[in-house]
């Protein structure tokens, strides 16, 4: 077992753990499970930090793969989905998840430029990134049969699905007010500006 292989395994597990933690944390924040116990800024900062950590760990994982002599990955193999000859499906999912992670994480820093709506839309990539990273780890990881690693995969998957169901349920249970109704309510009661005409005044 070489030092490169140890780094590959370790960085891969750390990267997945941080991706899972970032996804779970984001769902917990969006479902308002913290209430007002913690201010929004620290919650966002921690979410951001988890994403950055996952991005760095994934970068280390990819660099270590190009240095290992067992499979002999090249830069094209770790940067272009579907090119690698070893476990092509698993590696393609890993590469795609890396790009998804990069887009979601870096979107924090251009939020003011792209706007809240676009930023939220981009953030939906986080779910695909998590699923891709999970399948990549299961298919390509040499530690998949390890009880601790299996527990991490199963536990994170259950948490993400459970929190996602909770979020959808809460959104459906929250009544939405149409835009016109909100505008009318903000302006107060509407009165008829025309003067009252007594009945029979035209006779």
Language-model region placement:
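Membrane-embedded alpha-helical bundles that constitute the cytochrome b-like, heme-associated redox core
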Residues: 1-203
């Amino acid at each position: 077992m070489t030092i490169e292989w140890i780094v590959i395994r370790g960085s891969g597990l750390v990267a997945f753990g941080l991706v899972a933690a970032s996804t779970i944390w984001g769902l917990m924040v969006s479902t308002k499970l913290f209430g007002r116990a913690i201010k929004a800024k620290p919650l966002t900062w921690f979410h951001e930090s988890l994403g950055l950590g996952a991005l760095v760990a994934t970068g280390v994982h990819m660099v270590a793969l190009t240095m290992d002599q067992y499979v002999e990955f090249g830069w094209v193999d770790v940067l272009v989905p579907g090119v690698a000859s070893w476990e092509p499906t698993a590696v393609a999912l890993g590469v795609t998840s890396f790009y998804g992670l990069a887009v979601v994480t870096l979107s924090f820093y251009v939020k003011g430029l792209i706007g809240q709506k676009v930023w939220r839309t981009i953030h939906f990539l986080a779910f695909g990134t998590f699923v891709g990273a999970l399948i990549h780890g299961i298919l390509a990881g040499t530690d998949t049969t390890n009880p601790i690693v299996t527990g991490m995969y199963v536990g994170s998957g259950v948490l993400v699905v459970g929190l996602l169901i909770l979020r959808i349920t809460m959104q459906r249970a929250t009544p939405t007010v149409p835009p016109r109704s909100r505008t009318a309510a903000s302006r107060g009661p509407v009165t008829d500006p025309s003067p009252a005409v007594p009945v029979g005044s035209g006779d």
